[in-house]
Amino acid sequence: MYRMLDMNPASIGHWLPALVKANEGKTFFRIPKTTIAKAPLTLLQLSRVEYESLTAATLDVVDRWAQAAFRLKPDESYFLKTGTFSNKYDFRNAHVTEPHEVMQIGEYLLYLQSQAVEMAGPLSQPATYGVSTTNEMVVREYIPDTHDLPTIYMGLPLRCEYRCFIDCDTDELLGIHPYWDPKVMNHRFRDWPDSDNPHMRHDAVTYKLREPSLMREYEATKDLVATHVAGLLPGLDLAGQWSLDIMRDGDDYWLIDMAPAERSTFYEQAVPKGKRRPMMENWIPELGGKH
């Protein structure tokens, strides 16, 4: 099972090295510094235990593993995720800034994995399966917000983001879509069952006020982003169709995430039906020895 987790093409250890190589020698896009570690099986198993039941001694072991694996600096600010899941929608647990928080990054990472497990549980409506099907834990450089933008999701700056859909077999840009799509965002904050939650009320107002300038920024820059994404594709050594997320901060454009295209939101809106080719996945690792 552990080796099957290694087979997930969406895991960052699969696509990030190829993206870094494709961006070498180019100056338009930046990529945050990233450290990826394979979590021990015993650590992954802890996410199946109620987080509140874990003892201080257990959490201390997890923290010491993280300090050794990621070579953390107490005065740095970090963005945390598993190989496939960051839960930016609970940003206070994805972004650590204070020295005491950095010392507890192992706990934060374990909590992220536990959140992913809970999303597939019977108390989660709707239930979401497989968001953290990975054995990777990831610590990334945090990209500071240089424009003091309003925040949603308990601390996430509402910066302009772009979701590009690309075909790595044909080196073709299939489409581009605003990550913070107004129809999706307004529906999320106003129509979901938790819309009366104070955080959601805050986010509904914040997004509505930011929406006009956010969409103007997107429309003014999307062609520029698309042109530079197209320039990456000949050197991007991946197979199949992918989504590629870009975040703007001032004059900087950051390549921040990838996923198989058909698993990604806005796939049907951005990719023409005749161009869609879902990825063929292989989850069976090659085993050594005689058969």
Question: Can you annotate each of these PLM segments?
Answer:
Residues 1-161, 165-230:
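Active-site nucleotide/adenylate-binding loops and adjacent lid/helix of ATP-dependent enzymes
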Residues 80, 244, 256:
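Active-site flanking residues adjacent to catalytic metal/cofactor-binding acidic residues
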Residues 88-93, 243, 259, 263:
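Generic hydrophobic/packing signal
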Residues 165, 245-248:
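Conserved protein-kinase catalytic-loop segment immediately C-terminal to the catalytic Asp
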Residues 216-223, 227, 234-240, 248-291:
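C-terminal active-site "lid" helix and adjoining low-complexity regulatory extension at the edge
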